[in-house]
Amino acid sequence: MLIDGKIVECEFEYTKCFSEFYENEDIIRFRDNQLIDMYYHNYTYIKKAMSKIELKSIIQDEISLRLSEKSKFCNILLSSDFNSSLMSTIKYNAEISTNGYYSFDISYFSRLNALSGCIIKKVNNEEMVDDILFCDLQHDEKNLGKDFCTRRCYRRGKVYVSDKGVNSYVCYHKGDIIGNCDLFMYNGIAKIEDFAVNPIYQRKGYGIIILKSLIDIAIKENSHTIYLVTDEDDTAKEMYKKIGFNKIGERADLFFQL
């Protein structure tokens, strides 16, 4: 299921807010020298369908480049149909995952029921970046470690408080930090990213109010397409579909541990 080119372009522009890039007719390659171990700030996107031989050549070249950079991983994304049998011919084993692209049906907006008493604030200072770190640690400290979560948050926080275009929002209820979410808008397309509700507040309706608030902002900014990307193995996609998101495409992510 191919992804609309305008959405792919929005994905690239989003990553450019964090990473330097190199581009040719086949690929676009991103590098974030401030966070070299962040998989989705440092990846290569294969832009078009190609033969098995061409694809293998590009994958091998990208792995070789990452090895020369002394990196411990190589992350390659592609939205064309992917034949997994190709992987048996490559020296390194890939962890293959499928990510789905889901677009919000704006006609569902009025049906989104939101809890009262919540405040959604745009991140515009370092103190609020610390609130995002609080959320990140609730979610990811166990799996990713405090050091990485802290470095990731402050790296991304630099962009949130800048004018680069990626905005982050924090949800509060009675002074408690409930969750956070990012919003990026480009040429009428809005990308929702890093949506998270702290574990103790999940399945209580807070997620819907966060999403509704960001969708409302996007609509008021004249976005005609509002989308998010989620792992197809993640149960969250069922919630997204229930509230008005429809699948419009998917991509394969090939992650090589080097």
Predicted regions and their residues:
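Conserved GNAT acetyl-CoA-binding A-motif
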Residues: 69-79, 218-230
